[in-house]
Amino acid sequence: MIRQCRAGLRLCRALYQTSYRWHGKSACERALRYAPGESIHGFTVNEVTPVPELFLTAVKLSHDNTGAKYLHVAREDSNNLFSVQFRTTPLDSTGVPHILEHTVLCGSQKYPCRDPFFKMLNRSLSTFMNAFTASDYTMYPFSTQNAKDFQNLLSVYLDAVFFPCLRELDFWQEGWRLEHENPEDPNSPLIFKGIVFNEMKGAFTDNEKVFSQHLQNKLLPDHTYSVVSGGEPLNIPDLTWEQLKQFHATHYHPSNARFFTYGNLPLEIHLKQIHEDALSKFERIDPKTSVPPQERWQSPREYSISCGTDSFASDPEKQTTVSVNFLLSEITDTFEAFTLSLLSSLMVDGPNSPFYKALIEANLGTDFSPDTGFNNYTRETYFSIGLQGINKEDSEKVKAIINKTINEVAEHGIEAERIEALLHKLEIQMKHQSTSFGLTLASYVASCWNHEGDPVDLLKIGDKISRFRECLKENPKFLQDKVKQYFQVSQHRMTLSMSPDEQHYDKEAQLEAEKLTQKVKALSEEERKQIYEKGLELIRLQSKPQDASCLPALKVSDIEPKIPLTDLDITYAGDVPVQYCAQPTNGMVYFRAVSSLNTLPEELKPYVPLFCSVITKLGCGVYNYREQAQQMELTTGGMSVCPHIITDDSNLDTYEQGVVFSSLCLDRNLPDMMHLWSEIFNSPHFDDEERLRVLVRMSAQEMSNGIPDSGHVYASIRAGRTLTPAGELQELFSGMDQVKMIKRIAEMPEMGPILRKLSRIRKYVLLSDNMRCSVNATPQQMPVASKEIEHFLAGISRSKKERKSIRPHVVEKSSSPSSSGSEISRRATRKLVGDPTFKPCQMKTHFSLSFPVNYIGECVRTVPYTHPDYASLRILARIMTAKFLHGEIREKGGAYGGGAKLSFDGIFGFYSYRDPNSLSTLSTFQKAADWAKSGQFTQQDVDEAKLSVFSAVDSPIAPSDKGMNHFLHGISDEMKQKHREQLFAVTHSDLTNASNKYLTAGQCTRGTAILGPENRNIAKDPSWIIR
């Protein structure tokens, strides 16, 4: 990684000798040498501002000819990011900005090949590539650690957004079209097709999405926020190709653009390329895309909408959602918005907040309503508060509670200790280093900057915290005054309620059918003929091999041959192995521990995920659950627990099962954090039925709401269930089985039996037996951390008697980070369990859900991580996705997404997402295997697949996560280097051999699962299990 970056620096020096600021200086130092008024490649520097609390320097510029705005954030970070965003303000719900976002990425003047965006995924080492359509802007970001790659991607992105082809057939494919159900049969019925059309149909199966969309439309009804920028499925077929091209001409202009770059590459190089490749070809215009302020109401308003029923609701009679919404300040008033965001957090976050106490614990609903809290994605910010999972008759009660709570906060204010806890949380957020910090910043400033706000002022979080403290000091009722101003005096207040309608999806289907009939009836014979011919033309185009030679590409030789090594020190605290990893963590300490589940009785296993979810939220030691939450907020950045299932790296029938404990804190708070863990381990509370009931209902609601967004994940977990012993446990812990179990628990009248099961689990898990720990911190902090870990481990219990593993076949594997590790590190072992008698079997499951689209997973058992064929299968999955499945499933089939992947557990999986098809997609999966076996791909395709795989292998790792591959998965640097060498060595014949060996129908064991609407063909097939 370091060598790769240095190679990039040498390239930059060779190309741009004029970049004098680049030589021998840090990114921030170089940026500070710019002067306001200085001209650089057609741009003028407007402002240079150091922001020390975020270790960055911001340089604000504008383009002389076009007025394009530019923000460069210089930071010593090799994961460099580019983004360009346009203010896109549609006035109808045809989805024109969303369809345009898709279509500009389908080919451009310099790169006329079809789909350069997806092709660049395989010609680059990008760490991120995507595009987003928000309510009022469209953003195109990418990031990479390679300087040459940055220039390649920048060239493609600039040409895509400013000089796209916008071909009619691309509009048909990406947006919508009328096409015969079977495009080759003119007698088959005409239907609506299109990627965005199907994507939005899938999006609106999510009731939370439906609610959020209506909330914004109705609270801000005067301009662009009154429409669906992503597209309302019934309105999408009203968009014409001409309208799409016109929207591009008026909105995708440099005068309406905001450029953002981040990282340690020199600014001059970016400016030169952007000016020469794009901006020099334009003159300034007035884009007329500004959003006027919403006219404030004179009296509150109320609305009611309907949605689909939730088959996973814990109480079918309680499926109503109600919220009260308040329009707040302009987003460009950055301090006011900052203050209101803090006030919102204080009012709704955690069990000590007024609204949590008043609403969540009122036993009326399951969770807060969607969008609860502060929303700053529109020109004017807003606050939303409400409940979901309530009885419709309780709507008035909820509204009354909201009013009462607002009045109480206005009168009594917020406790000082809670304010300190929130400011502590902000301090941690500023110190914590993520690998995608550039993308985080680009997204953070996007909305405010979009409305002419100052993005640099937004970054000065330290200044805002100081000013906030000063305001509180000068006026102790500062926050109470804000509550009165925005929640009591203001009349711009909207109440929205949503209730299920059993006929909702039928009505949607009927309206779509009527729209279709209307469109078809209006067709002349000549137009019908053209539709048939265009359908055939689109298939020919989609099936035609693409020449992508016009696109820039890295070579496999650009990939660094060796991995950077991570120094790990493994010692013992008593008989517990502890991994120490010294890193520049910026004054933070990261603690993890793994506790084995090997001795846990089988009947308690299904309750492990619930145990993990609630163990840090029930109270412990001297703290009740409210006090515990307050202590966690005051002294930590969070404490979490989750199940841990890791398949062995050399045997698919062996796996580690456990629970992972994770937390982080500032250096100064390490003793307090470890004290909290001691209290949780030694004295957890399992005596509050009402508290558990609240947590279970929230968990059940969250799982149910997550299915429309993660349906393909649930399908894939289910499909892999019968292929390995770990797969069975994965389904139990994270699959549809867990969703249904939590739903059943939420329906139970008494929580006592569940509390007793959780208390029993504690006796097997919250012990130092079969535990290992890890710490990531600065070298200076390590001696203190070591003492605290030793003190913690010495103070927690051990089993009073030796417990045997429930599964008799136990495998001990060394935890040493290298074969030449110290004697102490070689003592450390991980205890895995195996089932030598396990026999994988085939199973096909269909979960019949009231969705208009399908989520599909098909899995094949292959080989473990260290097997020589694992590298071939990993590259095979990428080549099948890029060269076959993307075209068949997305372009031809109209699904939002689909592909193949190889997971660490040796499961080769096919999947599709928001897919209008079901059984035909399963046929496509088999065709993909046949295509791979036939070897219909080139050496160039193999090299591109390697680039794509290495972009994931070499993705940046934050200081907090260094060494985690070894600690959690048992993967050492030596093993990673060997795998790397195997990836480099994969040949064309290796891929065809792997396809024949592992993907041949009848020779491999497969699991299949579909989540989606009723299917008559599946219902008639006895080989399917229908749930």
From Swiss-Prot:
Primary subcellular site in the record, as a coarse category: mitochondrion
A Pfam family: M16C_assoc
Note on cofactor: Binds 1 zinc ion per subunit.
GO cellular component: mitochondrial matrix
Range annotated as the organelle transit peptide: 1-22
Residues passing through the membrane, by range: none
GO annotation terms (biological process): proteolysis
Region of interest (Disordered), ranges: 800-829
Cofactor(s) demanded: Zn(2+)
Active site: E101
One GO MF term: metalloendopeptidase activity
Keyword vocabulary terms for this entry: Disulfide bond, Hydrolase, Metal-binding, Metalloprotease, Mitochondrion, Protease, Transit peptide, Zinc
Regions of compositional bias (Low complexity) in chain numbering: 814-823
Binding site for Zn(2+): H98, H102, E199
SUPFAM superfamilies: LuxS/MPP-like metallohydrolase (SSF63411)
Modification(s) after translation: A disulfide bond locks the enzyme in the closed conformation preventing substrate entry into the catalytic chamber.
Regulation: Mainly exists in a closed and catalytically competent conformation but a closed-to-open switch allows substrate entry into the catalytic chamber. Substrate binding induces closure and dimerization. A disulfide bond may lock the enzyme in a closed conformation preventing substrate entry into the catalytic chamber, participating in redox regulation of the enzyme. Inhibited by metal-chelating agents. Inhibited by nickel and zinc excess, and slightly activated by manganese.
Disulphide bridges, residue numbers: C113-C550
Keyword Disulfide bond: yes
Known partners and oligomeric status: Monomer and homodimer; homodimerization is induced by binding of the substrate.
Described function: Metalloendopeptidase of the mitochondrial matrix that functions in peptide cleavage and degradation rather than in protein processing. Has an ATP-independent activity. Specifically cleaves peptides in the range of 5 to 65 residues. Shows a preference for cleavage after small polar residues and before basic residues, but without any positional preference. Degrades the transit peptides of mitochondrial proteins after their cleavage. Also degrades other unstructured peptides.
Similarity comment: family membership: Belongs to the peptidase M16 family. PreP subfamily.
Protein name (database record): Presequence protease, mitochondrial
Organism: Xenopus tropicalis
